[in-house]
């Protein structure tokens, strides 16, 4: 795994969002790393109506999509790293940043708070 996708990047890729046009370099990082935390977040967003998913098997199909590698980092490791990340109160963001840190791979995100605080970003996202 050379890159871990933040949840919104994963959603953009799956839905073929036009927002990806601003990030043509992302293709170089295939297959993209995905945290199980993102899969849980997608399910949560669908359950609360913030993401319209008409296929009940959507998350399961993502796990089998050859474009992605689901990285099964030990949860206890992620929690240990997440405990040190006090710059966000979002548990999903905290665990995704922790996953990136634990695996020492860049986190691909467009989240301003994460861009400002997380030290492991792709060169293309560093200011």
Which residues does each predicted region cover?
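Short, well-structured N-terminal submotif of metal-dependent ribonuclease cores
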Residues: 1-34, 48-61, 124-127
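Short beta-strand scaffold positions
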Residues: 5, 34, 72-73, 109
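Alpha-helix capping/helix-boundary segments
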Residues: 9-10, 38, 77, 96, ...
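Short loop/helix-cap segments at secondary-structure boundaries that form the rim of catalytic
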Residues: 23-26, 64, 114-120
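Acidic catalytic patch
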Residues: 57-86
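Acidic, PIN/NYN-like endoribonuclease modules and their adjacent C-terminal/linker elements
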Residues: 97-127
């Amino acid at each position: 795994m050379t890159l871990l996708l933040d949840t919104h990047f994963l959603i953009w890729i799956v839905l073929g969002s036009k927002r990806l046009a601003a990030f043509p370099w992302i293709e170089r990082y295939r297959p993209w790393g995905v945290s199980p935390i993102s899969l849980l977040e997608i399910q949560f967003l669908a359950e609360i109506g913030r993401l319209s998913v008409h296929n009940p098997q959507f998350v399961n199909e993502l796990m089998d999509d050859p474009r992605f590698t689901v990285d099964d980092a030990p949860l206890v490791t992620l929690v240990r790293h997440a405990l040190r990340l006090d710059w966000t109160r979002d548990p999903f963001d905290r665990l995704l940043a922790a996953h990136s840190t634990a695996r020492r791979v860049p986190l691909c995100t467009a989240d301003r708070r994460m861009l400002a605080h997380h030290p492991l970003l792709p060169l293309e996202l560093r200011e």
